[in-house]
């Protein structure tokens, strides 16, 4: 049987079309099997993390809907016990308390790769909210977080300000947050606002329902 040029082209187009469909199906299956590297929204939605400190417990409700990557990143550190024996190394009354990156000696802990900034998520740096700390590079947040002691509007995202990504709020332990925020601080090495008596994070874990 003679196969003309048009038939060959038509068959080629059909084969390429089927090949494209197979690749698309393969990509979808890969995503479903692999999952999200930093967790999924279903895993972290409505999650409460207990931050156990030497001054009491702080319970934080995470907002995975508004800040999915930031929340999943935080949970990765929680689940790996990364925060155990870290301290609140920066305490500024009337501003915020910051921790999650250093141990009591001032030695930094080795972190995972930084994440992209999710500050443009509609959440504000209000009193009692938790947000990711970072350097001047917007996409540099790793493990360090801070809790706002007051409404800090200047930390919010605007068209001219990258801001800081809020990903949850304190639901229990506001008095502990306030107590930590009122401890005496001093300069310790490179740190200007280090508590005179270390406020240690004994553990951070998921609250059981």
Regions found by a protein language model. Give the residues of each.
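Cyclophilin-like peptidyl-prolyl cis-trans isomerases
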Residues: 1-209
């Amino acid at each position: 049987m003679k196969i003309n040029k048009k038939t060959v082209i038509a068959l080629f187009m059909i084969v390429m079309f089927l090949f494209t469909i197979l690749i698309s199906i393969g990509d979808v299956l890969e995503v479903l099997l692999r999952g999200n590297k930093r967790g999924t929204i279903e895993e972290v939605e409505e999650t409460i993390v207990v931050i156990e400190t030497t001054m009491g417990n702080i319970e934080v409700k995470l907002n995975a809907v508004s800040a999915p990557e930031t929340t999943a990143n935080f949970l990765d550190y929680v689940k790996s016990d990364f925060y155990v024996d870290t301290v609140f190394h920066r305490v500024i009354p009337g501003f915020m308390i910051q921790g999650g990156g250093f141990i009591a000696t001032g030695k930094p802990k080795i972190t995972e790769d930084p994440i992209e900034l999710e500050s443009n998520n509609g959440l504000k740096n209000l009193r009692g909210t938790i947000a990711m700390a970072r350097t001047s590079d917007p996409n540099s947040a790793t493990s360090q977080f801070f809790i706002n002691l007051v409404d800090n509007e200047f930390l919010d995202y605007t068209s001219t300000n990258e801001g800081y990504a809020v990903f949850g709020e304190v639901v229990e332990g506001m008095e502990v947050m306030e107590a930590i925020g009122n401890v005496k601080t001093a300069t310790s090495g490179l740190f200007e606002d280090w508590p005179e008596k270390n406020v240690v994070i004994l553990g951070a874990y998921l609250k059981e329902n």
